[in-house]
Amino acid sequence: MAYEDTLAAVDAVRLMDSVRAICTGERLSNEAEVRSFDVLEKLFTDAGCRVTREALPGYVSTPEGAAFEAGGIAYEVLTHPMTPSADGLEADLVYIPVDRTGSASAEEVSGRIVLTDGLAMEPVVRALEDRGAAGVVFITGEEIHNMIVSRVWGSPTPETLHDYVGIPVASLSFGDGTRLRARLAEAGGTLPARLSTRVESRWTEIPVITAEIRGADEDFVMVTGHVDSWGLGALDNASGNACAVELARILAPLASDMRRSVRFVLWSGHSHGRYAGSTAWCDAHFEELERHCLLNVNADCLGG
């Protein structure tokens, strides 16, 4: 099939219908995620693929709620996966610019909740924890961004358990953060604060769906992506899933002319497991990947 013919075969209406069908709710190892995998199984089957499903063990973490107040005023915050819960942590709040978090003295931050800038990132939390901080609150953009605060790639091993942070973490909006910084300055640099977070971290079975269009030999090209999502996740990553389905629909009628197979592999455990699903699947299929996988195209946030 010529490139122009492939483009002409793309059905934009069908693509959007697939996105809507996949967006059954926030997909974080819950019923909405199961529904999305059921939808994908039907879509790939209808496209003409051979479909299989697996469940692999993986460690995931979901934020369940957070509350934060400083100087008697409550602020809307989000907490983050792979951080500990905190039940009413009370401490003085101080502001440390993010470019000083690695050089701040223990005297400045020890026993305090630190307000700082940017996305909730593990290296920043680690630097402040090492200096004795009791918790960290990040000032993000106008919208509060979901982030996973971990350097552990995939599920933990005995060697990486110590790499998780040990203090609670939350984020608030840029507007609230700017106003809070002004209040801190007016108060002489500190305010009494209280931080509560609830994070559920657990081992679970991570679903993976594989849809294949068989070519003539055992070598294959992969198209991969994650199904789990923060919120409805239309862009991240129902769009990528829908494009995989549409590509399968276009390629399936050409199977008899294909030398190599095309394998579509979609998993959970990406956003809330820091790649636990993809890591577990690659471990389980390592020998086959090593011998026969020629190329992987990861479809994530397409159309953004």
Task: Name what the model sees in each region.
Residues 14-17, 21, 35, 39-46, ...:
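Extracytoplasmic/secreted proteins, especially bacterial periplasmic and envelope-associated proteins
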Residues 125-134, 151-158, 281-288:
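Mature extracellular/periplasmic domains of secretome proteins
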Residues 98-148:
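A conserved hydrophobic secondary-structure block that centers on an alpha-helix together
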Residues 73-106, 156-236, 246-261, 283:
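Soluble metallo-hydrolase cores and metallopeptidase-like ectodomains found primarily
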Residues 53, 113-116, 135-138, 169-171, ...:
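Structural recognition of the beta-strand scaffold that forms the well-ordered cores
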Residues 2-13, 17-110:
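Noncatalytic luminal/extracellular "stalk/propeptide" segments of secretory-pathway proteins
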Residues 29, 57-59, 100-101, 119-122, ...:
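Solvent-exposed loop/turn segments at secondary-structure junctions
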Residues 123, 205-208, 229-304:
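Acidic/histidine-rich catalytic neighborhood of metal-dependent amide-processing enzymes
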